[in-house]
Amino acid sequence: SAPSASLNIVFSRVWGKAFAEKFEQRHGTPFIIRDLPIGPEATDEFLTDIAQRFGLDAKPLIERENRIFYGYFGRSADAFCDQDLKFYAITVTNSNYAIPLAKFVTRELGWIVTDSFVTDKLTDEQKEALSGEYPLQFKTGVQEIARAINKNHPNSRGQRYFDDITPLYIIGSTLEKQTAISRGARHLSVSFPVYDRLITDKGYAGYRGGLHLFEDLVGQIMSVKG
């Protein structure tokens, strides 16, 4: 049962802490706050932390999962080795996904995240909890976000010398799809609301979740390249 747990893990820097604190006060169960791990590097760090807390050896599990992930990753590279996979990325997600997604895209794929938008309505204290690793922009409206993207990265108007961010990938919700189309960018819906793709039993957390995300991102690129 829940009161017998040895540790509670809150996968959010802004949501769930109050509940975990009350649970600790009532049942004596400590808690930690961690970002949702996506992909091997983040999941390695997470499992190592948890294993050390309980005197366990996570190394065999980590090594096995890394072999699986990078095995698929390496074999998949043969299918698109002639593609340009050095992308710029803009993320538009809720507060729980913003930092984990940016970590995965930069660390595992080597892409450059130019903008990370957080769509939650947050207090100043909650915004501060998210600060530090990546520069975040807090905007809640679809048009507000679209204007910010176009202002930060205006399209070329035929200038000979133009610092353009291409190829560009917008990773957000279905609401950003039109903005992506208008800029000739790739797009993948991963954050609420999603109504341009069917998701029944797929998540992006952990090792296998990282593979799912890699598959979805690169699948979009290959479908466009044809």
Language-model features, listed with the residues they occupy:
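An N-terminal assembly and electron-transfer interface module characteristic of large anaerobic redox
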Residues: 1-226
